[in-house]
Amino acid sequence: MDEVYAALKKEGFSQKKGASAWCRSDTKIDIMRLEFYSVSICDKWRVPVGSFSIKPSCYFPFMPSLQAGRLWPDTLEMDSLSDFYSQMRLKVFKGIKQIKQPENQSFLRAVLNKVSGPKIEPEPLNIWWIGIDEKAFIQVTEDVIRQIQNKALVFYKRLESKNELIRTLMEDKDVWGCDTEEGIYDFGGNDSIKGLCYTGFTAMHIERFDVAKESLERCLDKLMDKYEKFQKNTMYEGKDGLERKVFDESLIACIENKLSEIKLLRP
């Protein structure tokens, strides 16, 4: 939808690749993605082909990436995994701290619901449909631009404040899975491994060392509990299991290092 990207460009989203446009500031990268759903997804969700969502999100360079991803090709034989183990741990540990393409990563995302546009039955509030004629397409385009201007830009501006960011992480509800509720999601809630990890690294960044220490210690406790349970239940076996193990061990090491830094920096 060229009109939408043109509107985004006026707001500073000068970089674009595929369905994503982004804008860099001193503290974060604001990302806007128009996600058109595949035919198979449309069939699964019982929405018409041509349905899409707008997905605003933010990337913060001081937060660790918690997206494990694929570490090796599917063709790699199990006999060779042990040879790659130490190498992969180092790779993931570095990857947790440094992301080469931050525009492809997001830490906090916002849910935006439509106000107008062609009807879909059943009516998912956060999915638009381009319709079957020019009038419907214009109506949808105008609504998407309006929601971006009235809500997405407010979301981006709100999270410019690091104090507001850490308040969100510590106090707000993650609205993941809430079909009718607008808000911020994908930070896991304030007592999850993800939420505690993000809170700890953000607090460290703004030199709130007491909050950072408490959050990261709780995060580490939860991670160690998870690690022990997975070990006991043989959930770290096979390719996928070993990938998960490598990632969990690397995240544990990363948090332990950050806690060591706090001991040195804390006044």
What do the PLM-derived regions correspond to, one by one?
Residues 23-267:
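Intrinsically disordered, low-complexity regulatory regions enriched in serine/threonine/proline
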Residues 12-28:
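A short acidic/basic microdomain associated with nuclease active sites
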Residues 1-17:
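Amphipathic alpha-helical segments
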